[in-house]
Amino acid sequence: MKKIIYQQDEKDCGVACIAMILKHYGTEITIQRLRELSGTDLDGTSAFGIKKTFEKLGFDAPAFKAGDETWQEKDIPLPLIAHIISEQKYQHYVVVYKVKGDEIWIADPAKGKIRKTISEFSKEWTGVLLFPKPKAEYKPSIERVDSLSTFFPILIKQKSLFITIFGIISSYYFQGLLDNIIPNQARSTLNILSIGLIFVYLFRVLFEYSRSYLLLLIGQRMSMSIMLGYFKHVLSLPLSFFATRKSGEIISRFLDANKIIDALASATLSLILDIGMVILVGTTLAIQSTQLFLLTLAFLPFYILVVYVFIRSYDKANTEEMSAGAEVNSSIIESLKGIETIKSYNGENHVYDRVDSEFVTLMKKSFKSVTLDNVQQSLKMVIELISSVLILWLGSSYVIDGKISLGQLITYNALLVFFTEPLQNIINLQVKMQKARVANKRLNEIMSISPEQRNTNINISKNIFNKDIKLDKVSFSYNMKLPVLRDVSLEIYSKSKVALVGVSGSGKSTLAKLLVKFYDPSEGNITYGDINCQDIENHKLRNHVTYVPQESFFFNGTIIDNLTFGLSHQPEFEKIFRACKAACLVDFINQQPLRFDSVLEEGGNNLSGGQKQRLAIARAILNDSEIIIFDEATSGLDTLLEKEILEYLIKLQDKTIIFIAHHLSIAKACDEIIVLDQGILVGRGTHEELSEKEGVYRRLLNA
């Protein structure tokens, strides 16, 4: 196992192991692509998901439950993947790439390469092994998207900055004149030398100021391109992405972008200013004294060696630090979202202890990273100080021997700072570039995910949403788990009012989310009229099909802003008022100090559950879609309010409305009831028809 691939997040150990095995056989695929193939979610990757991924990529991957005697076999196929229980009692995967005697060599995506005895390994090993081997028709392939070069087009946009930079460089021509004049005049006049040195130091201040200013300017321009580009891409991703990622993981990558911006901005200046200064001043130094300049260059290999030695350590430390930071972010965000539950169960200490433990881990990883940086900087300083002493030592000897003048030595040392500082800037890019490389891998995990379908070549008429909806043998499962829907075939008639009923977990909400294309069916087809929903771009479909969840989200803004959210233009006030009246909201709004201009808190925290649901219903009515899906959207209402709102919705003759409800009073009012049980369609008909038959609906009715 030549190179280990570290997991970017705690749930990525399985896909990191897959990536290592693939790389061993010449294939490189992004971690995010492997997450999609293996069905990795918030619970991690299953052994079944790993096996199926290898099979999709041209491998056989038999899985076995084995014992310690396996490690004594001479022909055990390596590398293989082993399932273990980590020290933190988490399920974990590692790659075993070498077995010799009573020792096992492991590539752990969380820790790196480790060597253990068989007895030590057996204490954590569950006995599960996967043996991936390429089939005869297997062909290696390489899919790379994590190069920093993907951001270079952003730099090209900064043409005005480059012109400014070249203008600054050209204005430094005066320094070149001084560098040439001083050596010729130093012997004859101390005054000229002193004045020249003052100009040199003034130029040094100007150079540093210009460098810092340009760094800030380029950084801000790039921040807008990279960070806003990332956020825009995240918004375009399918709902399935958010179901398999913690909020902290997504946000931490947004913050990681700063490392990329810092590195690229610094690299831009180094390529233009620092390298230019090194060449310009280096030429001047060589003219001053070839021997001293050669001595200066002799220390470059030592700098390069120090940089090279720390490359792998920096990669590991940065990956661990960023991953630990994502865990802390996730826990804090999760805790703030669930503060009511935490308070209800006196769980403050439990939550604090968990965050405290994760934060201590982050501090340890951060300390390790900073310590590496300190050690490297100390080594660089040793080289710099020794080189300075040797240059003065040798230079003074040359002055004594009459090979150079004292003025030449003073001038050389005065100019040397303009050679060493830009050189240090270039060398110090290593730390920033390595952090950026790790951050870029994490960022590109998200950027490489395909956004939701936007454009299709099929011209879609809005009239198709006034036609029947058909499901033909539709099945669906989340991330290679047990099917939630199984072979469902049904027809929902245009402008009908339909209720989906069944016990919890029967697949009602999942079916609704398929209709609005939050997810795609694993098998089968859904059609609106005669058009397959896969041929309808998501944005257009959701203009005509509105989904109202049980817990709708409200933004920090006025009531009217939240009611009209997502609309291309604000409707007339009369239309807004009618929608609020239909949702029984008028009295509530009249009680607010600024009525429609009253401000809602983030998440609607100053509203009750019932008030939120009525606002969500009013928003759906105002959206005026041909099809509306209410997913338990009246569960927080009292019986009288629910009845009044339901009567209005049932009377909407021009709309197809689908209700998902546990309250059978809603089902009774509908034209048709569809009954699901464990993902299977087990009945359909009116309330009267189903209540007379023995089955799930009758059991729900009698419960």
From Swiss-Prot:
Report the residue ranges that make up the Peptidase C39 domain in this protein: 7-132
Q: Where is this protein chiefly located?
A: membrane
Tell me the lineage of the source organism: Bacteria, Bacillati, Bacillota, Bacilli, Lactobacillales
InterPro entries linked to this entry: AAA+_ATPase (IPR003593), ABC1_TM_dom (IPR011527), ABC1_TM_sf (IPR036640), ABC_transporter-like_ATP-bd (IPR003439), ABC_transporter-like_CS (IPR017871), P-loop_NTPase (IPR027417), Pept_C39_ABC_bacteriocin (IPR005897), Peptidase_C39 (IPR005074)
Q: What does this protein do?
A: LagD (TC 3.A.1) is involved in processing the signal peptide and probably also in export of the bacteriocin lactococcin G.
Enumerate the spans annotated as ABC transmembrane type-1 domain: 153-435
Task: Give one Pfam hit by family name.
Answer: ABC_tran
Q: Which family does it belong to?
A: Belongs to the ABC transporter superfamily. LagD family.
Annotated membrane topology is: Multi-pass membrane protein
What is the official name of this protein in its record? Lactococcin-G-processing and transport ATP-binding protein LagD
Cell membrane as a keyword of this entry, yes or no, is yes
Q: Which GO terms describe its cellular component?
A: plasma membrane
Q: Which residues form the active site?
A: C13
Q: Name one GO molecular function term.
A: ATP binding
Q: Write out the entry's keywords from A to Z.
A: Antibiotic biosynthesis, ATP-binding, Bacteriocin transport, Cell membrane, Hydrolase, Membrane, Nucleotide-binding, Protease, Protein transport, Thiol protease, Translocase, Transmembrane, Transmembrane helix, Transport
**NCBIfam families to which the protein is assigned, alphabetical:** bacteriocin_ABC
Kindly list the biological process annotations in GO that this record carries: antibiotic biosynthetic process; protein transport; proteolysis
Annotated membrane-spanning segments are: 162-182, 189-209, 224-244, 267-287, 291-311, 381-401, 409-429
Entries under Gene3D superfamilies matching the protein = ABC transporter type 1, transmembrane domain, Cysteine proteinases, P-loop containing nucleotide triphosphate hydrolases
The organism's superkingdom is given as Bacteria
Q: List positions binding ATP.
A: G502, V503, S504, G505, S506, G507, K508, S509
Question: What organism is the protein native to?
Answer: Lactococcus lactis subsp. lactis (Streptococcus lactis)
The gene that this protein is the product of is lagD
Question: Which residue range or ranges hold the ABC transporter domain?
Answer: 469-703
**Which subcellular locations apply to this protein?**
Cell membrane
Q: What is its EC number?
A: 3.4.22.-, 7.-.-.-
